[in-house]
């Protein structure tokens, strides 16, 4: 997987023993991430869609590192392949350095005080393996969180809004297809996903 990441190539699927159990998948992800020398610029919550968690019989999502070389600016292109699963609209948060001095428990009530800015993001989701579909949450978690690239939008100073019920849509300009979504399908809401990552 590290070779596939560094060389931007697809490899044969890794053995199921690394993906069927989320704990094994997490250990593999952490090991692979430790072999990447590029700067870590953030973290993402993955597998946050409640229907997916229920289908895969998992109780909570996972998190993974976002490396600097995987972050794109608006207008840049992304190469996709048959192992690309799709794209997701995300909410990104910029966290104040004070958070790292915090010794208390992160809750839904206090998580907001550590946020300085928020921004829209688009994540390109997929594997670095020659496989498709999702049988286990570990399929995603083990493969660098299934994060291929991150497109970061303009950041805005954080203010409290009803982030738990924001509608959004993505349009494919070439085909005209429109996909609608809502933040209420994301592990209750994006702030709860952030609380999970920070905890």
PLM feature segments, named:
Residues 1-195:
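Catalytic-core "active-site belt" of small-molecule-metabolizing enzymes
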Residues 199:
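Glycine-rich phosphate/ribose-binding loops and adjacent secondary-structure elements
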């Amino acid at each position: 997987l590290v070779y596939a990441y560094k060389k931007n190539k697809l490899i044969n699927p890794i053995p199921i023993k690394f993906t069927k159990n989320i704990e094994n998948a997490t250990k593999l992800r952490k090991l692979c991430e430790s072999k990447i020398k590029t700067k870590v610029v953030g973290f993402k919550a993955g597998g946050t869609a409640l229907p997916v968690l229920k289908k895969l019989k998992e109780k909570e999502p996972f998190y993974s590192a976002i490396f600097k070389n995987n972050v794109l600016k608006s207008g840049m292109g992304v190469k996709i392949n048959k192992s690309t699963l799709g794209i997701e609209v995300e909410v990104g948060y910029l966290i104040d350095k004070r958070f790292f001095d915090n010794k208390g428990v992160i809750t839904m009530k206090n998580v907001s005080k550590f946020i300085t800015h928020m921004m829209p993001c688009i994540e390109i989701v997929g594997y670095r393996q020659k496989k498709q579909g999702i049988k286990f949450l570990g399929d995603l978690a083990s493969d660098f969180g299934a994060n291929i690239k991150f497109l970061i939008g303009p950041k805005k100073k954080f203010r409290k809004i009803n982030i738990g019920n924001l509608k959004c849509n993505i349009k494919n300009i070439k085909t005209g297809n429109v996909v609608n979504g809502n933040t209420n399908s994301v592990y209750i809401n994006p702030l709860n996903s952030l609380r999970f990552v920070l905890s």
